Amino acid sequence: MNNVILQELKNIVSTERVTCNEPLSKHTSFKIGGPADYFVITKKIEETAAVIQCCNQHNLPLLMIGKGSNLLISDAGIRGVVLKQEDNTEGFFVTQCEEGYLVTGGAGMNLSAFAMKIANESLTGFEFAAGIPGSLGGAVYMNAGAYGGEIKDCIKSARVLTKEGQILSLNREELELSYRSSIIQKKGYYVIDATFLLQKGNQEDILRKIEELNQARKDKQPLEYPSAGSTFKRPEGYFAGKLIMDAGLRGYRVGGAMVSEKHCGFVINTGDATAKDVLQLIDDVRRIVKEKFGVTLEPEVRLIGEKVNP
């Protein structure tokens, strides 16, 4: 561990928000992941920008995470700095405009909490996101979606930090949002906050829809187990979960990793899974589905760290 780098990071944020060899299993929804060389929590844009600058000066790799809900991190961990933005980053704002209402939230906000704040303002158009795990920044990064809605349907703009620490404001077109993809991924930007264009609605109807979607998730998804959400992207013309089920892989296990019996599109951690287990299972599922149906499944989960390529 480099004491000079450690001290620089502690000078940027308070000492208690910098740790060394932090187990990333504590910060991912999969409950899997080895240690980060340096783990830093930021609360302000200025802190995040300063950490980026520090990493650039020392040629350190930087990974920014939100709630860690779409990540599989190597058992060997992450070299360099892992930066996590806290929930309250940059707050929550609502302003009226000619087109409707603009709602802005910080990247570190819990996505479901952000959706409920919107519902409490009697604004409609964001109900689909209420049960999606993760942070707002992660949702924008991945163009998250569920039950017929996705981020690109309602986003107006997002502010990002470049790898050089420059702040950019990108409109909907500039974000280049498509299925689980964005310019943010392609350029390696870091989300600061995002603004959405929404409309007034009936609060009772909005809350009822959220409740219905959350119940559907509970009924259909293995929420009782750690996972990274949907493991595979939806192949054109197919559903990944059905292909996996039809291939006879329901309940298929490698070590502590298992294809969920409740929803075959999810790989779950039954208690002691390693990244190696999950990666082997992903390999097996992709191979068998390809052999049986000629369809190549692509991971939706971000595979990060040493020796994590499927």
From Swiss-Prot:
What are the record keywords, sorted?
Cell cycle, Cell division, Cell shape, Cell wall biogenesis/degradation, Cytoplasm, FAD, Flavoprotein, NADP, Oxidoreductase, Peptidoglycan synthesis
Reactions catalysed, semicolon-separated, are: UDP-N-acetyl-alpha-D-muramate + NADP(+) = UDP-N-acetyl-3-O-(1-carboxyvinyl)-alpha-D-glucosamine + NADPH + H(+)
Q: What is its EC number?
A: 1.3.1.98
- Pathway this chain belongs to: Cell wall biogenesis; peptidoglycan biosynthesis
**Active site per UniProt:** R180, S230 (proton donor), E300
Question: Cellular location of this protein?
Answer: Cytoplasm
UniProt enzyme class:
oxidoreductase
Q: Gene name, please?
A: murB
Alphabetical list of PROSITE patterns matching this protein:
FAD_PCMH (PS51387)
Instruction: Check the record and name the Pfam families matching this protein.
Output: FAD_binding_4, MurB_C
Q: What is this protein called?
A: UDP-N-acetylenolpyruvoylglucosamine reductase
Q: Name a biological process GO annotation.
A: cell division
InterPro entries in the record, alphabetically?
FAD-bd_PCMH, FAD-bd_PCMH-like_sf, FAD-bd_PCMH_sub1, FAD-bd_PCMH_sub2, MurB, MurB_C, MurB_C_sf, Oxid_FAD_bind_N
The residue ranges of the FAD-binding PCMH-type domain are 31-216
Species for this entry: Lachnoclostridium phytofermentans (strain ATCC 700394 / DSM 18823 / ISDg) (Clostridium phytofermentans)
Q: Which family does it belong to?
A: Belongs to the MurB family.
Q: What do the Gene Ontology cellular component annotations say? A: cytosol
SUPFAM superfamilies cross-referenced by the UniProt entry? FAD-binding/transporter-associated domain-like, Uridine diphospho-N-Acetylenolpyruvylglucosamine reductase, MurB, C-terminal domain
What is the protein's known function? Answer: Cell wall formation.
Q: Name one GO molecular function term.
A: FAD binding
Q: Which cofactor does it need?
A: FAD
